[in-house]
């Protein structure tokens, strides 16, 4: 069990690594993430676009699960949004959802898996 001084030190350390200017990401949003990839001695940014189906909030360890369908196969990736490997996050579209986790989209195909757009 951590005492209070150790917990404060950990919180101060976490504040240094939290990205301050992230867009507000909600469940159902379509996002475009730029992920840094190192191949040999080269570094490049690869973009990953999909729908946010889950989000786990826990300060520096906040993760989002992004799902996209590529050539008829569903692909899901979990991203730490405060990771230095994430170069950029852009919200392309907001969707109207009434669930905190959209795992039911895994069983839907084609037009059935579309979400209604939410305008702000």
From Swiss-Prot:
Supply the InterPro entries for this chain: Ribosomal_bL19, Ribosomal_bL19_CS, Ribosomal_bL19_sf, Translation_prot_SH3-like_sf
**Where does this polypeptide localize?**
Plastid, Chloroplast
Q: Which GO terms describe its molecular function?
A: structural constituent of ribosome
Report the main location listed first in the record.
plastid
Q: Which GO biological process annotations does it have?
A: translation
User: Keyword Acetylation: yes or no?
Assistant: no
Q: What is this protein called?
A: Large ribosomal subunit protein bL19c
- Gene name on record? rpl19
Alphabetically sorted, this entry's keywords are: Chloroplast, Plastid, Ribonucleoprotein, Ribosomal protein
What organism is this sequence from? Thalassiosira weissflogii (Marine diatom)
């Amino acid at each position: 069990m951590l005492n209070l001084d150790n917990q404060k030190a950990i919180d101060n350390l976490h504040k240094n690594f939290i990205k301050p200017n992230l867009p507000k990401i909600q469940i159902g949003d379509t996002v475009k993430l730029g992920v840094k990839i190192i191949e040999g001695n080269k570094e490049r940014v690869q973009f990953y676009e999909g729908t946010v189906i889950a989000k786990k909030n826990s300060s520096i360890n906040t993760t989002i699960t992004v799902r996209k369908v590529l050539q008829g196969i569903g692909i899901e990736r979990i991203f730490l949004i405060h990771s230095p490997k994430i170069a950029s996050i852009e919200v392309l579209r907001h969707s109207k959802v009434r669930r905190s986790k959209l795992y039911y989209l895994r069983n839907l195909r084609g037009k059935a898996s579309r979400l209604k757009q939410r305008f702000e």
